[in-house]
Amino acid sequence: MEKEQETLRAWKDRVARELDRVVAFWLDHSHDQEQGGFFTCLGRDGQVYDDLKYVWLQGRQVWMYCRLYRQFERFRRPELLNAAKAGGEFLLRYAQVAPPAKKCAFVLTRDGRPVKVQRTIFSECFYTMAMNELWRVTGDARYQNEAMEMMDQIVSWVREDPSGLGRPQLPGAPASESMAVPMMLLNLVEQLGEADEELAGISAELGDWCAQRILQHVQRGGQAVLENVSEDGEELSGCLGRHQNPGHALEAGWFLLRYAIQRGDAKLRAHVIDKFLLLPFHSGWDPEHGGLFYFQDADGLCPTQLEWAMKLWWPHSEAMIAFLMGYSETGDPALLRIFYQVAEYTFHRFRDPEYGEWFGYLNRDGKVALTIKGGPFKGCFHVPRCLAMCEEMLNNLLSRLAPASALSTRSPPAGPTRPGAE
């Protein structure tokens, strides 16, 4: 037991230090002091290589700053809150392409002019998360009103009439459902219902619907999690149907774990650990080089995506969350061993000790393929969310294992630290 505490404490300290370094990187390099919002196209050293602004990443960074400000005393600092508010105001002014219509741009120019619109719900989802978190830290009702109005629109698009997304219904296209849509909605249900029993009650049916839609992606007699299924929960033909994304399954796993825990459903919790944690990990871990494959084919055929064998930052971040959460809830040492396995690989391969933050894209053998720290798809989100959640879970585990007096002698880092020695 003492050795276990020492290992957990060492990882807690390591994760906390890394969170400080990651936050410092974004504080130093991403803020647009002139136009508002954030730069996310950042090179290895934080230099801006493109000033386009991606709405979903703007929303993610606002959410992340607010969450850190709200949940960690050492991040309760004016510079984080002010940057989050500036990012939120940038979104309020520019995210929606043609107000009062709710559709948000995917890409904006630096000064907020729309460049591209995606026919999906994801910019709108992260807009909603940002507004709700801003309301929680500021008390400004404008933000919550925006969040609730956008949530209503998203639910309408998903469950009633998708025509507002602008996707044509082509006769040859299969009626498919990506796991990403119910995952994202379940995340929003939890976000909006936090500490609000009335709203949580109203949205309970939506949460149940989302969970059931995610669970139907377990196919082939429980032997595979497929990224796409038909609208009635059946396997699709061809590459689309065989497509697997281990990192996405693991992220869905911890979303479902929290759902099961909130409902006190031990049977569902066990099912989720088996099918959404252990199954995608064991099938998705590269036995030769380590790390999680980005994409797989359920029949073992060669995936068509050029990046299928690469190792990306976010699946490993989500795996760390999933397995530490699974261990926290069950005490199963096998889950803790996998957390350590993933965390060691992740810290060794993705972490940049010289400039801070993590590399996002590795070749199959674990060597850095792209030196950028941010871009159209990587911003201030998966890495700090992973580190923040893992720090909290490790603290809670140590509190359960050790006397409070022993923990009180160890304080977390004083604040964000700049790149240097770990």
Curated annotation (Swiss-Prot):
Region Leucine-zipper: start-end pairs = 185-206
Give the record's GO biological process terms: carbohydrate metabolic process; N-acetylglucosamine metabolic process; N-acetylmannosamine metabolic process; N-acetylneuraminate catabolic process
User: What are its E.C. numbers?
Assistant: 5.1.3.8
| Pathway the protein contributes to | Amino-sugar metabolism; N-acetylneuraminate degradation
Q: Which Pfam families match?
A: GlcNAc_2-epim
Instruction: Please give the catalytic activity noted in the UniProt record.
Output: an N-acyl-D-glucosamine = an N-acyl-D-mannosamine
Q: Name one GO molecular function term.
A: N-acylglucosamine 2-epimerase activity
Q: Which Gene3D superfamilies match?
A: 1.50.10.10
Q: Note the InterPro entries from the entry.
A: 6-hairpin_glycosidase_sf, 6hp_glycosidase-like_sf, AGE/CE, AGE_dom
- The UniProt site entry described as Important for enzyme activity is assigned to C380
Q: How does it assemble?
A: Homodimer. Forms a heterodimer with renin and inhibits its activity.
Q: Which family does it belong to?
A: Belongs to the N-acylglucosamine 2-epimerase family.
State the protein's name.
Answer: N-acylglucosamine 2-epimerase
